[in-house]
């Protein structure tokens, strides 16, 4: 949905029933890591598809697959790195809260109501790019080395 030239909308967090967790603080770590881990698995899958298309350039579908797989790799790497930022409500913020001592975890968790505003501010300034790009480039290089692409 476009509203006034600005994309309006955001990904919704996966609902988690905290009362169903046996050890909420520790188990929240695993819940939070699942999102970025799924992005990593998808990036690996796209990299494998990219390699297969690259090895068969005469195939009719090679060129479109290379384009789709390249974008799939980039999107999933960016989402993984973004979600690992230690800013609640992002997954990285939840990981940090679950690993910090109680007092520091409480202080960090108090940022959560403002986390999206902080993230939007970072996104409309060059700061988010300064933070993300070195990590995104590193992950992209690691995938390139792993798959020889």
Feature map (PLM): residue ranges:
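Hydrophobic transmembrane alpha-helices and their immediate loop junctions
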Residues: 1-149
């Amino acid at each position: 949905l476009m509203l006034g030239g600005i994309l309006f909308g955001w990904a919704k967090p996966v609902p988690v029933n905290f009362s169903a967790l046996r050890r909420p603080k520790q188990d929240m770590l695993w819940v939070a890591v699942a999102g970025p881990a799924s992005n990593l698995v998808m990036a690996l899958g796209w990299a494998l598809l990219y390699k297969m298309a690259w090895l068969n350039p005469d195939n009719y579908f090679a060129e479109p697959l290379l384009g789709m797989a390249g974008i799939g790799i980039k999107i999933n790497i960016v989402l993984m790195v973004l979600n690992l930022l230690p800013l609640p409500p992002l997954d990285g913020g939840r990981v940090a809260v679950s690993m910090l001592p109680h007092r520091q975890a409480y202080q960090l968790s108090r940022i959560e109501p403002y986390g999206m505003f902080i993230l939007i501010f970072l996104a409309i300034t060059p700061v988010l790019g300064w933070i993300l790009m070195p990590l995104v480039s590193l992950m992209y290089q690691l995938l390139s080395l792993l798959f020889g692409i």
